[in-house]
Amino acid sequence: MKISAVDQSPIFSNTNANSAIRETIELAKFCDSIGMHRFWVAEHHGSDSFAGCSPEIFIPSLANETSSIRIGSGGVMLMHYSPYKVAENFRLLESLYPGRIDLGLGRAPGSNPVQAGALAYGSKTTGPEFFTTKMNDLKSFLIGENAETEAFESVDVTPGLGSLPETWLLVSSENGADLAAFFGLPMSLAHFIEQDCLHLVDRYRKNFKPSVF
């Protein structure tokens, strides 16, 4: 069995965010040293409890401090961001650390409404209702095809195609399981959030559509 870990960089009593970040680095190094398979970091904003706010910034530091364990996001909250920029960030990470990068995607905001608004900064295409559109375009940008959004059909993504990051969807609901199955994505099940969720595995397998992922 392959054992993996996700760390939210918790800020414990009498410590601070800087200490939490350093502890995550040490934990990643330990997980690598005992042969674990993956190590993911989370995205939370404006939190007094969790220090990890930017997986795409944290990932290269962790990859540089380790030797073989896969490093990834658990996850990037796609509702806030441009699929184009997410694709470029993670294709660049995959170029730097080939065969070791995971792009875990989340559908939750990872923030309160005020912080979500600050992340959007006036954009009209944020929110969970845009996830399917953004996921379609992200898929196209990752694999080097024309985006489904007509305005972006001619957009090229750098760096050029090589190996792709493994792309996952974080799931804690039936809707999430359905989306993972529809897009043919590996599913990371949030059993620590929803204990009664094993039925989602059967639902996912029943509806799964194979894809490039």
Indicate where each model-derived feature is located:
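N-terminal beta1-alpha1-beta2 module of alpha/beta enzyme domains
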Residues: 1-66
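Flexible, glycine-rich active-site loops centered on histidine and acidic residues
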Residues: 2-17, 79-145
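Hydrophobic faces of well-ordered beta-strands that scaffold small-molecule active sites
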Residues: 3-7, 39-41, 71-74, 101-105, ...
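Aromatic/hydrophobic pocket-lining residues that form the small-molecule binding cavity
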Residues: 20, 24, 55, 86, ...
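Acidic (Asp/Glu)-rich catalytic clusters
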Residues: 32-33, 59-68, 94-101, 181-182, ...
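An alpha-helical appendage that flanks or caps ligand/catalytic pockets
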Residues: 33, 124-157, 196-213
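Acidic-and-aromatic substrate-binding clefts and catalytic sites of carbohydrate-active enzymes
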Residues: 45-54, 79-84, 193-200
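A conserved active-site cap/scaffold subdomain adjacent to cofactor or substrate pockets
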Residues: 175-193
